[in-house]
């Protein structure tokens, strides 16, 4: 199972059920369980990371706030944003947490290069940036030597809700999205992202599914 990957395309989903399913998957996986990546668009929601502070929620209005157990601070998820959850056995891949973060940042940087978008990571604030404007947020959790949670890449969405928070705890952090820089569809970006992931983490066999994880 070391070099096998299952990619689940889950479509549009509320945040909490997917978060709970990640927990169930991670709790029940063992050394023979293949790694999975879940691709999803969430209905509008603010999620607070473990380091999140209430003062970074400025005016959430009618958008719900969920306290999550990922790393990092507050962010926004909504339609038109590609969320990728990485359910990876780090011990099997011989990866440390910092290495995985770097791999994920590089994954996004390489994906954006396909669309002639130059981007970079920042040592002081995880994620990916285009000229100091944030295009991708990142937050992970590790349990039993396995990762869950992942990245949120802004593709073609309403960025206004980010003005209701201090994104990732940074007041005035400007957000940007792929469609501001290059016309593209969610499906195109998903395809490139998975191709880059397979190359970066050396997966040899990839299977796709549209079924949600069912632990029963």
Curated annotation (Swiss-Prot):
Its EC number is 2.3.1.181. CDD domains: LipB. The gene is lipB. Belongs to the LipB family. Keywords: Acyltransferase, Cytoplasm, Transferase. PANTHER family: LIPOYLTRANSFERASE 2, MITOCHONDRIAL-RELATED (PTHR10993:SF7), OCTANOYLTRANSFERASE (PTHR10993). The keyword Transferase applies. Pathway: Protein modification; protein lipoylation via endogenous pathway; protein N(6)-(lipoyl)lysine from octanoyl-[acyl-carrier-protein]: step 1/2. It is found in: Cytoplasm. The record marks 134 as: Lowers pKa of active site Cys. Catalyzes the transfer of endogenously produced octanoic acid from octanoyl-acyl-carrier-protein onto the lipoyl domains of lipoate-dependent enzymes. Lipoyl-ACP can also act as a substrate although octanoyl-ACP is likely to be the physiological substrate. InterPro entries: aa-tRNA-synth_II/BPL/LPL (IPR045864), BPL_LPL_catalytic (IPR004143), Octanoyltransferase (IPR000544), Octanoyltransferase_CS (IPR020605). It holds the Pfam family LplA-B_cat. Its main location: cytoplasm. GO terms for molecular function: lipoyl(octanoyl) transferase activity. It catalyses: octanoyl-[ACP] + L-lysyl-[protein] = N(6)-octanoyl-L-lysyl-[protein] + holo-[ACP] + H(+). In the reaction, the free carboxyl group of octanoic acid is attached via an amide linkage to the epsilon-amino group of a specific lysine residue of lipoyl domains of lipoate-dependent enzymes. One of its GO terms (cellular component) is cytoplasm. Residues 31-205 form the BPL/LPL catalytic domain. Substrate binds at residues 70-77, 137-139, 150-152. It comes from the Bacteria. This is Octanoyltransferase. GO terms for biological process: protein modification process. The active site is at residue 168.
